Amino acid sequence: MHLPSSLLIAAPLLANVSAEPIRIPQRDVSVVSTSQQLAVRALPDSPSGGYAPAVVDCPKTKPTLRKAVDLSNEEKNWLSIRRKNTIQPMRDLLKRANITGFDSETFMNEAANNISQLPNVAIAISGGGYRALMNGAGFVAAADNRIQNTTGAGGIGGLLQSSTYLAGLSGGGWLVGSLFSNNFSSIETLLSENKVWDFENSIFKGPKEAGLSTVNRIQYWSEVAKEVAKKKDAGFETSITDYWGRALSYQLIGADMGGPAYTFSSIAQTDNFQKAETPFPILVADGRAPGDTIISLNATNYEFNPFETGSWDPTVYGFAPTKYLGANFSNGVIPSGGKCVEGLDQAGFVMGTSSTLFNQFLLANISSYDGVPDVLIEAVTSVLKEIGAKRDDVSQIIPNPFLDWNNRTNPNADTLELDLVDGGEDLQNIPLNPLTQPVRAVDVIFAVDSSADVTNWPNGTALRATYERTFGSISNGTLFPSIPDDWTFINLGLNNRPSFFGCDVKNFTLNANQKVPPLIVYVPNAPYTALSNVSTFDPSYTMSQRNDIIGNGWNSATQGNGTLDSEWPTCVACAVISRSLDRLGRQTPAACKTCFERYCWNGTVNSKDTGVYMPEFKIADAHALDSGAVAIGKMVNVWSSVVVGVVAATLLL
C-alpha cells in the first residue's frame, strides 16, 4: 500500500498534529533558530597548531597506563553528574509512554534518591559507511528532544538525553565523531548548515565550498597531503589512514580545512561534556597482531573515549590516556628521559582508524575509475605495492602505548607500533563490546544496525558475532543474549523490524562474579520510506538521497511516528525500565508484557534457506528513484579514488 506523498513530506522541523511517517526536508536554514546554528568547537588543542603531534613537557605527575579492573576515575566522576542529568528527560519519556499499571513518577522519584535504580541506557551505531552515518543519524534525530515533534504522538524524543553512552564504529563512528566534533549539535542543525555533511561531492572531489573543479581537485588533496607530511616531518609514522581521516574531516568537522588541530581528547574539555549534558562518546577499532591479515573474533577490541584508549579484553586489559597516546610508554610508564606527546589523537585520525577497511580494498583494480590518467594509475599501482609490503594499510600508533604491557597475553607487547583496523572487521559491526562490560552496568542498548549482510540489508550477523565471542576466553566472562542464525532473522522478520534480545533474565546462568547482560533493542535498517540499502562504497549522495535515508532512519526509530505501531513509544519505555524492575524484584506491567510478547525473540528457530532477500516497503516509497536504491553488485571504489588523490597531491609537494 502506498500512502499519499503529501503524508511523507512532513518534517520534524515543522509543526504537525498527526503521527505520520516523516521525510527529512531539503536544506532550509530559515527553519533553524540562530541559537541552534552550528557551533564550531573552540578547542583545536593540538600543540603543533595543525595535524602533526608534538613533543610537550610532561605534567608533574607523568601519565601512566592502568589495568582494566574498573572504570577510570575520570569516567566515574563524569558519570556522577551524567546519571543525575538523565533523570528529568527519562521522567518525561516514561510519563509520555503512559505505561498502564506503572507509576512512572514514583519510580523516578525513587531513582533520583538511589541512582543504582535508575535505568542505564546506551545507544550503539553500527558500521556501514555513509549508509550507517545517515541511517544512524535518523535514529539519533528521532531520539533527540531538542528537535521539534520528537516528543509528540509516536515520538521517542528524550531517549538520547536519557542515555549515558553513545558508541559508534566505522560509518557509525563518523556520526558519533562528527556530532562531538561540532559541539554535539543536533542532526537538525547539521542538516541545516552548509559546513558539514555535504555528500554531493565525494571525498575524492573535495568540498564544494572550496570552489574546486575537476581540474584543481589536486589542490584539495595537496592540502590533505601537506598536513600528513607535517606529521611525518615531526618524526611520526604515517599510513593511508592519515589521508583517509584528513579527507573525512572536510565532510564531518565544521571548521576550516576540516579542523586539523582538533583532537578527540579535547571533547573532555568542552563545556557541555564537562557538565555531562551529552552522552559519553566511544569509538571502536580492532587490533591486528603482528603477521595477521585476517581479523577473527579473537582479535582484541579497542575503544577510544575522551579520557582513555585501550581494551577490556584479557589480551591487553589496560588503558592509556587518550591525550598522551604518542608518549614513550613502556610497561605502563614513561621511563626516565621518555617524552610526552600530544596531538596523536587527532579527531579525523581516530574516526579514520575506526573505519580503515583499506587492507581489504586498496589492492583493487583502480584502472576502472573514470578519468584517471595512465601516469597516475602507474603511480598508484607502485604505491599500493609499497603499502602491501610495509603494511601501511592499517592505522599505526607509534610508539605503541602497550609496549611491554601484559607480556604474557598481549600480542603487541614486543612491537614498537600498535596496528589498528576497522572496528567491524571481526564481524562485530555494532560497537557492543564496550557497552556490555559489567563495570559499566548498562541496562539496555539500542543497537542500530546498518550492516550490509544480505542484499545490503542486515541479517543479525553483527549481533551473532558478539554472542559467539562470549564462548571464548577473549570475552573475559562477559555475557550476551542468545542470538539465532541468519535465516531465522530473515524468516521471522527479526531484521525487518525492531527486535528485543535477552528479555527474560531467568534465561541467564550466572557464574561467580558474572552479571546479567543488557537487554538489546535491535533496530535494523529496513525499507520504511526509502531503499536505504545503498552500497557501503557509494562515495556521494544528493541532498535528496541523504535526507531520504535519514528520514528512513527516523521512521525506523519511531515506527513511522507510530503509524506501524501506536504503542511503540510504550515498548521503548518498557525496554528502558526492564532491568531496573528485575533488580528491584518488581512485577512487569501488563503493558510491558504485551510489548515483550510482540518484540522479544522467543527462541523460535527457522533456518530454511528462502532465497534472495528482497524486502518490500513497510510504509511507502518516498521517491524510489531519488532514495538511493542500490543495484546489487554496484560498487564505486572510493578507496581507490582516495589513493589516486593522495598520490597526485604528493607529486605536488
Swiss-Prot record:
Keywords, in A-Z order: Glycoprotein, Hydrolase, Lipid degradation, Lipid metabolism, Secreted, Signal
Superkingdom of the organism of origin: Eukaryota
Glycosylation sites: 98, 114, 149, 183, 298, 328, 365, 407, 459, 476, 507, 533, 561, 602
Keyword Glycoprotein in record: yes
Subcellular compartments: Secreted
E.C. numbers: 3.1.1.5
InterPro entries: Acyl_Trfase/lysoPLipase, LysoPLipase_cat_dom
GO cellular component terms given for this protein: cytosol; endoplasmic reticulum; extracellular region
Ranges of residues in domain PLA2c: 57-606
A Pfam family matched in the record: PLA2_B
Keyword flag Nuclease: no
Reaction catalysed by this enzyme: a 1-acyl-sn-glycero-3-phosphocholine + H2O = sn-glycerol 3-phosphocholine + a fatty acid + H(+)
Signal peptide (from-to): 1-19
Molecular-function GO terms, alphabetical: lysophospholipase activity; phospholipase A2 activity
Effect of residue 45 to N: In strain: Lindegren 25a
GO biological process: glycerophospholipid catabolic process
PANTHER family xrefs: CYTOSOLIC PHOSPHOLIPASE A2, LYSOPHOSPHOLIPASE 1-RELATED
Family: Belongs to the lysophospholipase family.
Function recorded in the entry: Catalyzes the release of fatty acids from lysophospholipids.
Name of the protein in question: Lysophospholipase
Lineage, broadest ranks: Eukaryota, Fungi, Dikarya, Ascomycota, Pezizomycotina
